[in-house]
Amino acid sequence: MSKDDLIQFTGTVLELLPNATFRVKLENDYVIIAHTSGRMRKNRIRILLGDKVTVEMTPYDLTKGRVIHRH
């Protein structure tokens, strides 16, 4: 699977979970579990409750995603 197959959504962080994982409500009212991308961990970018984030998801599992950008 290439990067072209990934789907991007914008959402809001609802809940902070352990291990850099978050419950995110997407703009289409779905709630998913998302983890922080490696570059965000490496650069120590903090994500707080209520932050607007961009989430990248695979079309095979629409319940999990990866946070790639904080707005």
Curated annotation (Swiss-Prot):
PANTHER family: TRANSLATION INITIATION FACTOR IF-1, CHLOROPLASTIC
GO cellular component: cytosol
Oligomeric form and interacting partners: Component of the 30S ribosomal translation pre-initiation complex which assembles on the 30S ribosome in the order IF-2 and IF-3, IF-1 and N-formylmethionyl-tRNA(fMet); mRNA recruitment can occur at any time during PIC assembly.
GO MF entries: ribosome binding; rRNA binding; translation initiation factor activity
InterPro entries reported for this sequence: NA-bd_OB-fold (IPR012340), RNA-binding_domain_S1_IF1 (IPR006196), TIF_IF1 (IPR004368)
Gene: infA
The entry's keywords: Cytoplasm, Initiation factor, Protein biosynthesis, RNA-binding, rRNA-binding
Domain S1-like stretches: 1-71
Top-rank taxon: Bacteria
Compartmental location: Cytoplasm
Cytoplasm in keyword set: yes
Organism the protein comes from: Rickettsia felis (strain ATCC VR-1525 / URRWXCal2)
TM ranges: none
Name of this protein: Translation initiation factor IF-1
Family: Belongs to the IF-1 family.
Record bears the keyword Protease: no
Major place of residence: cytoplasm
Biological role: One of the essential components for the initiation of protein synthesis. Stabilizes the binding of IF-2 and IF-3 on the 30S subunit to which N-formylmethionyl-tRNA(fMet) subsequently binds. Helps modulate mRNA selection, yielding the 30S pre-initiation complex (PIC). Upon addition of the 50S ribosomal subunit IF-1, IF-2 and IF-3 are released leaving the mature 70S translation initiation complex.
